[in-house]
UniProtKB/Swiss-Prot annotation:
Keyword rRNA-binding in annotation: no
Protein name: Putrescine aminotransferase
Alphabetical list of PROSITE patterns matching this protein: AA_TRANSFER_CLASS_3
Organism: Salmonella heidelberg (strain SL476)
CDD domains xref list: OAT_like
Entry function: Catalyzes the aminotransferase reaction from putrescine to 2-oxoglutarate, leading to glutamate and 4-aminobutanal, which spontaneously cyclizes to form 1-pyrroline. This is the first step in one of two pathways for putrescine degradation, where putrescine is converted into 4-aminobutanoate (gamma-aminobutyrate or GABA) via 4-aminobutanal. Also functions as a cadaverine transaminase in a a L-lysine degradation pathway to succinate that proceeds via cadaverine, glutarate and L-2-hydroxyglutarate.
Binding site for pyridoxal 5'-phosphate: G150, T151, Q274, T332
InterPro entries tied to this protein: Aminotrans_3, Aminotrans_3_PPA_site, Class-III_PLP-dep_AT, Putrescine_aminotransferase, PyrdxlP-dep_Trfase, PyrdxlP-dep_Trfase_major, PyrdxlP-dep_Trfase_small
Family recorded in the similarity comment: Belongs to the class-III pyridoxal-phosphate-dependent aminotransferase family. Putrescine aminotransferase subfamily.
Documented EC number(s): 2.6.1.82, 2.6.1.29
Cross-referenced NCBIfam families: PRK11522.1 (NF008570), putres_am_tran (TIGR03372)
Residue positions where N6-(pyridoxal phosphate)lysine is found in the record: K300
Keywords: Aminotransferase, Pyridoxal phosphate, Transferase
Amino acid sequence: MNRLPSSASALACSAHALNLIEKRTLNHEEMKALNREVIDYFKEHVNPGFLEYRKSVTAGGDYGAVEWQAGSLNTLVDTQGQEFIDCLGGFGIFNVGHRNPVVVSAVQNQLAKQPLHSQELLDPLRAMLAKTLAALTPGKLKYSFFCNSGTESVEAALKLAKAYQSPRGKFTFIATSGAFHGKSLGALSATAKSTFRRPFMPLLPGFRHVPFGNIDAMSMAFSEGKKTGDEIAAVILEPIQGEGGVILPPQGYLTEVRKLCDEFGALMILDEVQTGMGRTGKMFACEHENVQPDILCLAKALGGGVMPIGATIATEEVFSVLFDNPFLHTTTFGGNPLACAAALATINVLLEQNLPAQAEQKGDTLLDGFRQLAREYPNLVHEARGKGMLMAIEFVDNETGYRFASEMFRQRVLVAGTLNNAKTIRIEPPLTLTIELCEQVLKSARNALAAMQVSVEEV
């Protein structure tokens, strides 16, 4: 029997939610009731699969903590009042911390003036953010398209490359094995994981995947395309594969890919949605090799963990294909004043506090500690790797990785696996994480591994 719409039920539910939003604290009974509600609503109205995932990485087989508020720049508090050190960082959105006061203030000030743009008049913050990114990004990157997420940023990059290269008879893209570029149809065509791709086949034609970090395979793909008349329009790469398991290519790989693109007249698209905004110890990971892309994709941390925003930045030569008709690719909420205010404040904080350099220093401290633990527990840990504050601990199998995440949850540290590689646990904290908290994270990791070792020995 079909359920009839109920305005009264919707009104009551929305009023209840607004009441919760207004509250700063909850008593014990309110906390218990909220937990039950959230679990029930996820099961009945969001997706029950999320509950099973949360259950697999939390302590005691619970469905996990119900998030309530930020505790500090570097911590989260659940409805039970438990404070967790955030080493997941919302998959890389909290580079400047949770509720950074500079970012929050900028958004609040803009909210008091004009939350969204008229679509017809020129909006100043979009112009100022585009100018700021032109100054901040490497090489000849100059023009920006703004959107709301990483996958939208990649979609824009692919369409821009198509519009530029189609008149030149070039239609094929090279992506890499293990890549993750998003889950909308175009971005998914560049993404490599079969689990995400197979249900939506056939995807967009014209995408080849070659092994990541293998410059010979990349060179062969270019040469074969030239021989067969199926010439390469663009290469799309992550400088470090995030969801693939924090996979670093050999030093010089990006430089060699840039040379191939120049030799064969292809565009280089760098997806820095996860590696950008100071995460790896430079503002952009491509700066470790002084590589200058033709198109750069940003999102996640660009909004300071306060507003969603993505950006696709391109050279004037490439972006000029949109000059005659700027409506060829647009989005209603892209570049809205609130999101641009957040992005401008985020860039200001990153530069004023020199957070990329801090990421390099504190990342070295954490990575050294994780590598020491890998040496101490070789039967559990295969490898620790990373750059800056983008790190991963790879375990011997998926089950061991899940167990580590659960044990860290007991230690009040949030971590999780990567989307393409379940046995790899990412460590991606805010760049504002203090040295004291870095030491606490390492202590918690040691305690977690020790508990896991005891369980192994008891079997």
